[in-house]
A protein has these predicted regions:
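Short, positively charged patches
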Residues: 1-132, 139, 321
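Glycine-biased, small-residue-rich flexible motifs in mid-sequence functional cores and linkers
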Residues: 2-3, 83-323
Length: 323
C-alpha cells in the first residue's frame, strides 16, 4: 500500500521533489504514517499542498494508476526507496543534502548503493584512447573492490561499466529514464549476475529518456561517488555539466591529462585549471594513487577497511597521455 501511495504523490501534476520532501518532513514532525495523511486529506493542507492539487492527488483514476504501477514494480523485482529509509544511499544524502532525490527506484543488488564507489563521466563519442583509459581505470577500481558508477550511455560510460564487470567488480547503472524501460545492453548481458550490479533511477518508472533528465541524473552519479573521473569532455554538453557540478558540490574530480587534447577532450585542461586533479600515466597505465587516497580518507572517517592501490608506484606526477 505504501508504495502505491508514494507513486500517487509522484504521479500528481503539481507535485515535484520539493513538495514530496515537504510531505515527508510533515509526517516526521507530526509522527504520522503515510496512510494517515491519505485517510485525513486535511493533513495534506497542513503539509503545504493546495486544494486543487489535493483533489487531483486523491482522484480514483490516479489511485488506480498508482496501484497498477506499484504492481508492475513488484512483478519486476524493483525496489522503491525513500530518503527516510536506511537502504537509501547515505553518501548521496550527505553529498547533495536537501537536493537529493526523495525517492529512488532500484533493481539489483541495492547494497552497492552504500558501497565505496567512484563515478565516471565522459563523451559518448570518446576516442579509442579515452575508451582504453576508462576501461583501465575501472579495472583498477574493480580489483580493489571499489564500485564503478556511471550513466549507462554509449562510449565512456559503457566502457567503465563493462570493464568493472569483466574484472569481477561491481557497477551502478544510473539511468536518465525510468527504470521500467531500461534493458540490459548486449555488450554486458553475459557479464551480469544477481550480485554485481544495480540499476537506479530517480524518475517515475515509466519515464522515457530526455536530455533534461540526462543532465539531472548527473547529481545522482556524483552523489553516489566518493570521487569522479572525467575521461574526455568537450566545452559543452552532459560531461561538461557533470564536471562543473562535481567541482561545485565538492566532489574530488580527477581528470585525464592528455598531452595534446583533441576535440573530444578539449575541456580537460579547463577542469584541471579549475581544481580538478590530473590523472597521468606510466607505460600507458593510469595512475590512480590519489583516487585511492581519497577513498582511504573516507574509509578512515567511516571506520571501514582501507583499500590498497594496485596503481603503478613511484609518485603521482607521471606522463601525460597521448591521444
Amino acid at each position: 500500500m505504501t508504495n502505491s501511495r508514494i507513486l500517487q504523490l509522484m504521479l500528481t501534476k503539481g507535485i515535484g521533489d520539493a513538495a514530496i520532501k515537504r510531505v515527508f518532513d510533515f509526517l516526521d514532525e507530526e509522527s504520522y504514517l503515510l496512510d494517515d495523511i491519505f485517510e485525513s486529506p486535511e493533513l495534506f493542507r497542513k503539509a503545504g499542498l493546495k486544494q486543487d492539487i489535493i483533489e487531483r492527488l486523491l482522484s480514483t483514476q490516479l489511485k488506480e494508476q498508482a496501484q497498477s504501477m506499484a504492481d508492475e514494480l513488484d512483478r519486476n523485482n524493483i525496489r522503491l526507496i525513500t530518503e527516510r529509509e536506511t537502504q537509501y544511499p547515505q553518501y548521496l544524502k550527505c553529498r547533495l543534502g536537501k537536493k537529493c532525490p526523495p525517492i529512488l527506484f532500484a533493481k539489483g543488488n541495492i547494497s552497492l548503493l552504500n558501497h565505496a564507489a567512484v563515478g565516471f563521466c565522459g563523451s559518448r563519442k570518446a576516442s579509442q584512447k579515452g575508451i582504453s583509459i576508462a576501461a583501465d581505470c575501472a579495472k583498477q577500481l574493480a580489483n580493489n573492490n571499489i564500485v564503478v558508477v556511471s550513466g549507462y550511455a554509449a562510449g565512456t560510460d559503457l566502457a567503465a561499466h563493462r570493464s568493472a564487470l569483466m574484472n569481477m567488480g561491481s557497477t551502478v547503472f544510473v539511468l536518465a529514464e525510468g527504470i521500467l524501460p531500461a534493458t540490459i545492453k548486449r555488450d554486458i548481458c553475459k557479464l551480469i549476475n544477481s550480485e554485481n550490479h544495480v540499476f537506479v533511477s530517480q524518475f517515475l518508472p515509466n519515464t522515457t529518456w530526455n536530455a533534461g533528465n540526462a543532465m539531472k541524473r548527473n547529481g545522482v552519479i556524483i552523489g553516489l561517488s566518493q570521487a569522479m573521473i572525467l575521461v574526455e569532455s568537450g566545452k559543452m554538453g552532459g560531461t561538461f555539466a557533470a564536471g562543473e557540478e562535481a567541482l561545485r558540490t565538492g566532489c574530488p574530480l580527477f581528470v585525464i591529462d592528455f598531452s595534446k587534447p583533441e576535440v573530444s577532450a578539449e575541456a580537460n585542461p579547463y577542469f584541471i585549471q579549475s581544481g580538478g586533479y590530473p590523472i597521468r600515466g606510466k607505460n600507458g597505465i593510469p595512475n590512480l594513487n590519489k583516487v585511492f587516497a581519497v577513498i582511504n580518507d573516507n574509509s578512515e572517517k567511516a571506520n571501514t577497511t582501507p583499500v590498497e592501490s594496485s596503481a603503478p608506484k613511484g609518485g603521482y606526477e607521471q606522463i601525460k597521455f597521448d591521444l
